[in-house]
């Protein structure tokens, strides 16, 4: 009973991952599009990490003190997420560079220094590298999408574009919801980890639970964002 809120938090997140995995798998079977397969793997591996915590709290009524089982699942999920971020964009976006992407390490490195004072160095390196890379690619994608939207708007005013002699910018705007969702996901991960360093409580006064509920929402939103990015 002491850990009831914690249990429901993890259970909700696991159910969200299970629903997302089922939905992504169904879309993959229907369309045979690779991003849906990667998304199903993302949901599945992240959900397995959460399931470990859920069962631990349910059966032993205590928060896990050994994180390796869950962290392996979460690190695997970051690999699938990064693979999606490398395969969904166009070749032009992959070549695009922006200095704003450096915001990701500027935020992640100080957080990493904080985390290693509380936890394992090796797994914190892997998890922070994964989330930092995801944030880097998302920021780049958002800047590229903004640039593409501006160029497309200018192109509509161009006579050559109107006559069809100039190529339209294409799909960058379609990836914007996906990049926003991934960026929200990584930001909430950092908020979650940071709150766990300073607050220890099993009540809703602990911001950890609110960040985790929002994280579950961002995980579910990943399915809708990916579907929009894929286009069908």
Model-derived regions: residue spans:
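Alpha-helical transmembrane segments of multi-pass integral membrane proteins
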Residues: 44-49, 74-86, 96-120, 127-137, ...
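Cytoplasm-facing juxtamembrane segments at the starts of transmembrane helices
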Residues: 33, 37-41, 89-107, 126, ...
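Internal transmembrane alpha-helix with an interfacial aromatic "cap," most often the third helix
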Residues: 20-31, 58-65, 70-104, 112, ...
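Membrane-interface helix caps and helix-loop-helix hairpins in membrane proteins
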Residues: 59-65, 113-125, 199-203
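Hydrophobic alpha-helical transmembrane segments of multi-pass membrane proteins
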Residues: 12-23, 36-59, 70-80, 178-198, ...
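C-terminal transmembrane-bundle signature of multipass membrane proteins
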Residues: 136-232
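Hydrophobic transmembrane alpha-helical segments in integral membrane proteins
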Residues: 1-19, 113, 117-126
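Hydrophobic core segments of alpha-helical transmembrane domains in multi-pass membrane proteins
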Residues: 71, 124-133, 208-213
């Amino acid at each position: 009973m002491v850990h009831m809120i914690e249990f429901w938090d993890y259970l909700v997140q696991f159910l969200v991952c299970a629903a997302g995995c089922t939905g992504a798998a169904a879309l993959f079977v229907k369309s045979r599009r690779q991003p849906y397969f990667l998304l199903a793997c993302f949901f599945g591996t992240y959900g397995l990490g959460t399931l470990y915590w859920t069962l631990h709290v349910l059966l032993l009524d205590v928060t896990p003190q050994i994180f390796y089982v869950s962290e392996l699942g979460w690190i695997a999920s970051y690999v699938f997420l990064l693979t999606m971020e490398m395969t969904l964009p166009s070749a032009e976006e992959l070549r695009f560079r922006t200095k704003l992407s450096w915001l990701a390490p500027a935020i992640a490195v100080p957080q990493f220094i904080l985390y290693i004072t509380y936890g394992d160095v090796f797994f914190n390196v892997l998890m922070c590298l994964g989330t930092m890379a995801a944030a880097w690619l998302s920021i780049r994608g958002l800047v590229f999408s903004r640039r593409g939207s501006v160029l497309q708007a200018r192109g509509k005013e161009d006579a050559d574009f109107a006559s069809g002699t100039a190529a339209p910018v294409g799909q960058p705007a379609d990836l914007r919801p996906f990049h926003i969702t991934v960026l929200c996901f990584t930001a909430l991960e950092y908020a979650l980890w940071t709150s766990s360093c300073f607050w220890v409580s099993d009540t809703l006064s602990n911001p950890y639970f609110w960040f985790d509920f929002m994280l579950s929402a961002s995980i579910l939103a990943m399915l809708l964002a990916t579907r929009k990015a894929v286009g069908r």
